Amino acid sequence: MALSKDLMLKCSEDMMSAYKSACEEHPKLKSFDASLQQRTNKMIDSLTVEDKNGSSSPHDAHMELSKHLVEVTQGVADFITEIEDDVWDNQALKYLVLAYFENTKKTLEIFKTIENCVENAEMGQLLIREALAEFEKESAEKDVGGKKKKYEKTLEDLKSFKEMGDPFDGKVLTTQFERIKKQQESLLEEVSETRKKIQDEISNLEKKTLITNVVFGAAFAIVAVASIALIATGVGAAAGFGALAAPLLAAGWAGVYTTLDKKKDALNKQLEGLKKVEEIEESVEKGIKTNEEATETVSILVDGLEDRIKNMLKLVDNAIDHEDNEAATRIVLTQISKKVEKLTKKITEVGESVEDHSKLIAKARLQVLQKINR
């Protein structure tokens, strides 16, 4: 599920450069990024361990990336809930965070669809198991008078399984994955626009801080020049200097300094707040990227399960086609017997993984909404 080339060209260079700089400047973001890299490296290592067939299974890949997505989503939630400044007054930021967790809601919708598919697949498993039980029972039976077809009940159950079809077939999941892709592309564009707004605000504040320093320097210079002028003109000598300089310092230098110092502190506080906004926005951006990876892997996993079930359907076809050939039927049903437990295990694990993942994302989302809406 790759992002469009135009969008990548629009976002990647500036955003990655800004992200790198932000990590170098902000300790918390640097720590967040370091933990993210560590988890990613661990995930890559686990996915590159080859099994005896020379590749990592789609199911294992899903389990690793699903765990990774949960950790990143929780990381984004933790980062946001730790922020205590008034950064949530920034509506652009608030909208961005809400948009991110709206994106995770779309992911939950996909997982719910997969859960429904898993339930249907489990119903199919019951029919397969019943067919296998009948197979064992009918294998021990003697054919009475040549009139009773052996494995008749077995084949009835297999036909029922075939009639159910493939629970992962159709366009439902494909359509939802396309929806999540478009949602993510739209969200990345929003991230890009929000970054620009935040950077403009920071730039303006930095300019204001510079101006206050210039004003302060000019005021100080006026006082200094006035003092020099007093001495140079010899007005009142030291006593006269003191009489004129003291009011100037009190009304000018000290007053300007105090005013500008307060203003500078206020501006710096706002600037730090906006820099924290950038940190949050960067962590949200990372969350989007990882969310995309995880949903892509769910797609791979679904393809894997779909292939397994289609293989089972072919075996069922084989058994039905050879119902008059006892030896061929036995061979096919034996193959089904070997495959059914593996398939059942995979389907169960997928269901449990998706359910756990959904709960964790929903919990993280609730934490964030409570934080920014209080």
UniProtKB/Swiss-Prot annotation:
Ranges in a coiled coil: 171-210, 256-321
Entry-linked Gene3D superfamilies: 1.20.1170.10
Chief location of this protein within or outside the cell: membrane
Intracellular or extracellular location(s): Membrane
Bilayer-crossing regions: 214-234, 235-255
GO cellular component, one term: cytosol
Annotated membrane topology: Multi-pass membrane protein
UniProt record, GO biological process: cellular response to water deprivation
Highest taxon in the source lineage: Eukaryota
Keyword terms of this UniProt record: Coiled coil, Membrane, Transmembrane, Transmembrane helix
Pfam families, A to Z: DUF677
InterPro entries: DUF677
Keyword Secreted: no
Claim: Oxidoreductase is one of the keywords in the record: no
Family, as annotated: Belongs to the UPF0496 family.
UniProt name for this protein: UPF0496 protein At3g28270
Organism annotation: Arabidopsis thaliana (Mouse-ear cress)
Upper taxonomic lineage: Eukaryota, Viridiplantae, Streptophyta, Embryophyta, Tracheophyta
